[in-house]
Every structure is written in C-alpha cells, then in structure tokens.
C-alpha cells in the first residue's frame, strides 16, 4: 500500500511537469535543481521562477550550464518572456509602439519574408552569433525610439539591477563611516540597552540605503490622483526641444540654478560646527514663525512643554513679550514638568573630560548657550563637548530652526537651512534611544515636515513609513487605548495621531498611493480646542481635555479645520481614484455622492474655517484655507478613473477652482511667502495644465478669452520660474508648460484665413502647423519676460507688449504626429468658432470620438506626473545622500504648502 501511495504522488508530479512553463504553448520545462541548492547539497523544490529557498534568502535562483559551467537562467522561456516584457514597457514609456516594430522572423503571412543576409550579420554583434546580454541592444532601441528627446538622456534611468545593487552596497559602506544621522525610529520597545540601539541603527541604515537607490522613477508607483493630462499634446510638449530655445541661454535661470550647489556645499562643508547656535533673538524669531505657520496646522508640539523641556535648558526662560501662537491668551510661565512624569527629561552625568571651567559654566542655573558663548570668547572650542542631556534639545531646536527659517523659501538662505538640519541630525541617535517613544515620534514628524520642504535622506516616503509603523505600534489610532492614560498624555497622543493622519493623507493624495492607516481603523477623537496654556501636567482634576469647552481663542481651530479638509480630500481620493472603492450605501450613484461631498466642502469653507486673527489667536495666513478649498474642488470634479470625461458643470467648477489656485500661488509668490517647494511646483504645474485642458476642450462658452488665458498662463510661469534653484523639477515644468501653453493658445484662438479648409494637405497635423505658423506672425499670442521677477503686481499692459515666445510649430506637430493616430484627427476642425469637433460630422463619428476621448483620458492619465511626480520622486523620495543634491542632472523623460510653511 505504501508503494502504491508513493507511486501515486510521483505520478501527480509528473503530470504537473508535463504542463510546462506556459499554459498557452505547452512547452515542458526542465526539472533540475538550482545552482545554490546543488552547491549546498540540499533538496530543491524546483519552483519557477525561483525556488522557495532562494526566494526566502533573496538571492538569484539560476542554473549551471553543463557545457560551459556558467550561470544560465533556470528557464529560458521565463527569461525571454520577462526580457521582452521589460523592453516593450520601456519602449512604451519612450513613446514607441512595440507592436509596430518588425523583426526578421515572420509571425504571420502578412509579414515580410525571411532575409538570410540579416540573419547572417547577427554574428557580428557577439560571439557565435548570439546577441549580447549586457543591455546594449536595449539601450540602443530605447534611445532610438526616444526621438523627441534627442538631447542627453541620462543612462541612470536604465540602470541594470547589478548597477543598482552596487550603488546600494557603496551607500552601505559609506554610511558605516557616518555618525548615524540618517537613522529612522523603529517601532519596538523603548531603547534601554546599547544592543537594542545598535540593532535599530543597523536596521535604519538599511532603510536609508533602500531610500537612496536611484532606480528609474517609472518603477515607483504613482497613482491616478497624482494628476491628469490631455492626450498627446502634453506628452509631446514635455519631450519637445527641452534643451534648446531661449531658456538655455537665460542668465537669470542659470544664476538661479547655482543655488543647488550652495545646498550641496552646506551638506559637505568640512568646517561644520555641530555646537554652534544662532543668537537668542534670531532663535526666537524662527521658533515664533514655526509655531504660527507650521505648528498651528500640525500641533505636534505642546508650546509650554517645548519651552520648558527644550528651549530653557539651552537659552533660558522665554521672553514673555514674544507670542507663540498666543496673541490673545499669553504663555503659561507657571507650567511645570513633575520629575515623576514620563515627559520629564532624564538627565545623565556630565562627561568627565570637560574642563573645570566648563563644568562651572554648565551648572544647573546657567543655560548652555551662555556656556557655549563663553567658550567662544576664551577660545576653548576644541575642549568643549555637549553634555548628553542636551542632545535631544539640540535636535528639536535645530530642526525647528531649519523649518522656521525655510518657511519663506524665496527669502531664506538655503545654506543656513541645510546647516541647521545637519546639526539636528547630528544628535538624532539620542532621540531614537529615548525611552519616550512619543518624543521620538514627534521628532520624526519634524523630519517628515522638513523632507517635504527640502531634499533629505532618507526621503519623505520612507520617513513617513517609519512614522506610520510607530503610530500603529503605539496604538494612537485607537481611542480604546487612549483611555488608559492620564488627560495630558491622552491629549498629546491624539495630537500626534492627527498630525500623522494629515501628513499621510496629504502625501498619498498627491501621489495617488494607498493611505497608511485605513479610515475604518480610526477611532481616535479630535484633540482639545483649548489653548496650550490651559493644558497642564499637574491638573489631576480634569479627566479629558477634549470634553472641555474652549471659551478663549486658540490656534487649535486652524488644526481642526485642516483635519476636516484632509478627511474630505481623503474621501474624494478613496472614492474616485481607488480601483476597488465602494460607494457608501446611502448614495444611489456617484453623482449624488459628489453633490453631497461638494455641499460638505462648502459647509467646511463657510463654517469650519476661522475668519479672523482673533479667532485663530495668531496671524496665520488664511489663504491656505482658500488653497485647500480650490484644490478639493479640482480633484472632486476633475478627470478621474470614475469620471474620465467632464460635463458642463464639471468644466465650470474646474475652471473656477484652477484659476483660484493660480491666484493663490501667484499672491504667495509676489509676497515671497512660498514654502514647501516641490509641493508648490507639483500643484502649480498640475493646476496650470488642468486650466489649459479646460479651456482647450470646454464648449458652450465655458472658457476664458485669449487675454485671460494668457494672463493666467504667465502667472503660472512666474511662479515656476521663481522656484528654479529651490526645486530641480521647477525648470522642467517651466519649460514644458511654456511650450504647451503657447501651442494650446494658438490651437484654441487661431484665426482661419484660408477658405479652402484646413485639411488640404495630406498631413492634417502639418496642415495645422502651417496655419499656426502664419498666424503666429500676425498675432502676439504669448510672450514672457525671462528677466528676474521684481516682486511687482502683474501688469497686463506690459505683458501684451512683450515679444511672443516663438514655437517651431512645424516641428512640434511633426513630433506630435509620431505619437498620435492620424485617423483620430481626421474629423477635427479648428474653426473660427473654436469648435474642436466638426459640427457636420456624422453621429457615428461623434460617438467614436467620444469613445476615443474616454479611452484617451483613461489610458494616458500618467503623462503629466512624468514631469512633476517622477522628478519629485527622484529628488525628494529617493534622493541620494552625501551632499550631491545640487549636482544631479535632470532627465525630462523621468520625470503642493507655502506661506511661511503652510501645508497645502
């Protein structure tokens, strides 16, 4: 019986093997052990494409060629299918249709016959007539197909896995020589031993290395909510003549680009002094700006706790005449931290190698700033060391200095910002070794905020991932767990959670990624609206601060309004952009849900948004509420997978919301109050493109006149140009938008002088180009002053007098034709009435065009974020370290938040 049972199993395995690798062609695969299992002399399960042992150890699973002894794929069928799929995907990314490429071997009777001469010439490409497997042929095909970007295409976008692994190993080697400044907090228990801290250090260095792998941005997922596009016009404009034209010779742009080098020099300055502190008055200004502009929206720091725990040990008591989001209430100078509290600083003995003079100056009653200042006067810097008890205060102060100084990016000094951040990361290991994990979470959240503003290692996506893991590990999303803590701790936990929630929803919405914590798992209440001066550690009579009314003004109304708009935005993204999202049962259809969401958005703007400084208890710029209001309407009624076409109502709402967004950013630019640079670039470019889309396609007079379109177009370009030097993707977006806006305006507002019809030529696109070229000579369609922005209000008269931006339309439309199906344009008529579709076309033709428009918007929705999101990913998400931020080149093929630190 046992023998029969064994034979039965063997028979089953044999039947499985006969099925082969591919169910479609029935090719039997060789059942042989892999190389590693052979060398280890262990049983191989012979699974494809990798055995379980190799997959578990994350090592290549290959076989040995019995003839040559060299490594070979375990299945050539799997290998060739994968290789072909990769090449076809890369060709599509570069605008080449793989299905139109014909080889020498015919596949159907309609193909060209076999050419023996071509087959014989293959032997010249490699030994024994075999094509080389080093990627050169793939490089050649991709570069050949990428005709619209014939200028320098960096080879990094096609780096082989071997190259990426080498880069990762080099980073790991270099990171061992550093001081652990790139660490991330893990989610384990408090760090009470050196072994646990060392384990955390190694783990987070690996995360940092993962975040710096310079793989192609196309390998990084960017979802539908990251942006929309309108067909091949966008694709052509973003790849057309990027390295030619007036911008290359623009000295102003070249000077702006020099700022990248300043940031890199600050990151690598060998004379860096980690102990240096700004003067007290400068520190007070930056801290005040941080609390008004950033902490008011994300109240992760309790004001009095911050002053008592971090500021006073370094600078001494705070000046009561300086408000910290406390214009109407003041600061509670009697705030105390009980020694038994979990929030008290656990000091350690002073280092023994510090001189006697420094010991005296470092007494309990003397702030460390006085000690440091004294050491500078008597030239004792070489022997001064920072006591361990000041490491965490140094981190918090310096990262807040960096954020506070960078909130007005057009005024800030990029070198100073980088230096403050570098000092903070010098002491970040002490933060992650703290027994207070809420403190570690708050510090990491500050790093996330900085990473949104400036390049950082690891990037914001990986830092935010660590924050989310720690948040879930602490149970901050669950109100049930919060009930186990005292009122003050419960309040801090709620505040930290909603800060994490806001940042997660913001980042994921911009880049179309799944949210870190699902809505159905969140039960945590909103934090209290009381001002921080009324929330103390010593009041044991209060059970829950969130239950108390707030009779006095408080900046918490700003944060609460931001929490609510993030929830609305998250609902929009989840319903309209997530492929598997379900509509709430109380709604009959998507349109009824959208109307209800629109009404909810209006209620938020009219009721929840504070209307004056007195209510906000500080001078927070309320323009950020306008920005979120317009942005939310844009994503609610703009193109999305659930609404790939727009009706008249959507066209009207999106037109108004995009103009509102452009006005807000232009106002911030004029007043030099833009911050969070890459978010501003991303939002401004996407909004500008959406504005052009609406004006290009909308009918029934739902569009702006030529003068108005030109005015808003220049506003977009002014903002993008002023951000060059602070965000590397700004120049790419500036050039692409400049080209596309000129073409769209000429297409939309051209005047037809030829009565013979616009498609008299055999090439419809070339015919359009000829007409546009003649029109360009007669009309000043679009002109831009590339001089330095002088901070003056937009002058329409001066704008109309400027020389037009000359676009070689013959070349543009020739390039456009390469990526468009000409038959799609056969019924197009750019008439004087601005009708895109010929009114005399048949019903069937119109239906076909509508179907094509539906598919077009659905299929190529990712074109725009190749310019912003792809480049932003490379710059801020997987940025390489070692101070090379200012030197990295930009590839056009690879490729929101601003007043004084406002977060859009």
From Swiss-Prot:
SMART domains per the UniProt record, alphabetical: Fungal_trans, GAL4
Subcellular location: Nucleus
Gene Ontology CC: one annotated term: nucleus
Matches recorded under CDD domains: fungal_TF_MHR, GAL4, ZIP_Ppr1
DNA-binding region residue numbers: 34-61
InterPro entries to which the protein is assigned, alphabetical: bZIP_sf (IPR046347), Transcription_factor_dom_fun (IPR007219), Yeast_MetPath_Reg (IPR052202), Zn2-C6_fun-type_DNA-bd_sf (IPR036864), Zn2Cys6_DnaBD (IPR001138)
Keyword Transcription regulation among record annotations: yes
Residues reported in the UniProt entry to bind Zn(2+) 1: 34, 37, 44, 51
UniProt keywords, alphabetically: Activator, DNA-binding, Metal-binding, Nucleus, Pyrimidine biosynthesis, Transcription, Transcription regulation, Zinc
Biased composition, class Basic and acidic residues, residue ranges: 12-21
PROSITE patterns xref list: ZN2_CY6_FUNGAL_1, ZN2_CY6_FUNGAL_2
GO terms (BP aspect): DNA-templated transcription; positive regulation of pyrimidine nucleotide biosynthetic process; positive regulation of transcription by RNA polymerase II; pyrimidine nucleotide biosynthetic process
SUPFAM superfamilies cross-referenced by the UniProt entry: Leucine zipper domain, Zn2/Cys6 DNA-binding domain
Biological function: Positive regulator of URA1 and URA3 expression.
Assembly and interaction partners: Binds DNA as a homodimer.
Annotated protein name in UniProt: Pyrimidine pathway regulatory protein 1
